[in-house]
Regions:
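Conserved catalytic cores of very large enzyme subunits
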Residues: 1-303, 316
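Single conserved hydrophobic/aromatic residue that forms the stacking wall/gate
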Residues: 308-315
Length: 316
């Protein structure tokens, strides 16, 4: 059920915006324990009804088999629904799935998250069948796997997941990798604490932000980008004719143009009522504003971002 609702939310959110979105498997992991408790109760009742005399250990063993099967079906649902659902823009949702073990507390929840990550990687290695019945690499969801102390060495607890991720990358060119150690050095908040978190969709990384409305706790989920502008550095170089002074002059002109383009996005969004995309602005995907309230207060400060990309290649 959690996986089904997640994919429905993905499709609806994608229909209300441009660009990608990211979800974390850490947010699905707690539901594994709910299923486990349900199956333990269910198996115990079935054994009692059929006259099977089994101890608690055997009941848990059978329940665990059902948990594994439910994880498999849930992950499969996400993969196939994402590539078959169409947004109102007429395309599959651009979604990234984040796999970070340390995002949940150590214990059963982390063990359950590891099970979900393992199943995601196994299914991506297998791929999906196209209309001709051939196993292919799906474009989405994109996968990001975090390298951390628990999975980077052969004697690490979750080394098997990193091996599986490497096998998946060799065959399917995903997942991409984030180093927790390096990212925590680069993404440091105003209190000097480093953080590891997913990019927004394919590539845009947020700056650290501590939410004053929530005891200054770090906030990364539920934030957004106002718009992206790309600067073609190769074109700037070619236009300069190998003259460095001319290169810097052209670059300054292009950067000013990029700034104007980014501000156009900002001014265009000002005054937008939350009613234009209720799932984003009213129902919690990005905020919980009142009906009729404008989104203006979300367009200022560090909660949102604007992005300037640089292109290093040329299209022929």
């Amino acid at each position: 059920t959690a996986c089904n609702i997640a994919t429905q939310a993905i499709a609806q959110i994608a229909s209300s915006q441009y660009g990608g979105q990211s979800i974390s498997l850490a947010h699905l992991a707690p539901f594994v324990q709910i299923s486990r408790e349900k199956f333990i109760k269910q198996v115990a009742e079935e054994f009692k009804a059929t006259g099977i005399d089994a101890g608690e250990d055997k009941i848990k063993e059978v329940a665990e088999l059902r948990v594994r099967d439910e994880i498999k079906r849930g992950v499969q649902m996400i993969q196939y629904q994402v590539i078959t659902l169409m947004t109102t823009n007429g395309q599959a949702p651009f979604v990234t799935v984040f796999m970070y073990l340390d995002e949940v507390p150590e214990g059963q929840t982390r063990e359950d998250l590891a099970l979900v990550i393992e199943e995601v990687l196994k299914q991506r290695i297998q791929g999906v069948k196209n209309e001709k019945g051939v196993w292919i690499t799906p474009a989405f969801p994109k996968l990001i796997y975090v390298l951390e102390e628990d999975n980077i060495r052969e004697d690490s607890k979750y080394w098997n997941l990193t091996q599986l991720a490497a096998k998946c990358t060799a065959k399917r060119m995903v997942p991409d990798y984030i180093s927790e150690k390096i990212m925590k050095k680069l993404k440091v908040d105003k209190f000097g604490e480093g953080h590891c978190f997913p990019c927004m969709g394919c590539r845009s990384f947020l700056t650290p932000y501590n939410d004053p409305e929530n005891d200054n706790k770090p906030k990364y989920y539920g934030r957004f980008n106002q718009g992206v502008v790309t600067l073609n550095l190769v074109d700037v170089a070619c236009s300069s004719g190998k003259d460095m002074d001319k290169f810097w002059k052209i670059l300054d002109e292009r950067l000013e143009l990029c700034k104007r383009a980014l501000m156009c996005r900002h001014y265009r969004l000002k005054g937008t009522p939350s009613d234009v995309a209720p799932i984003l602005w009213q129902n919690g995907a990005l905020a919980r504003l009142k009906k009729g309230e404008t989104i203006d207060k979300l367009l200022y400060g560090d909660r949102k971002s604007t992005r300037l990309n640089s292109s290093h290649g040329k299209l022929s």
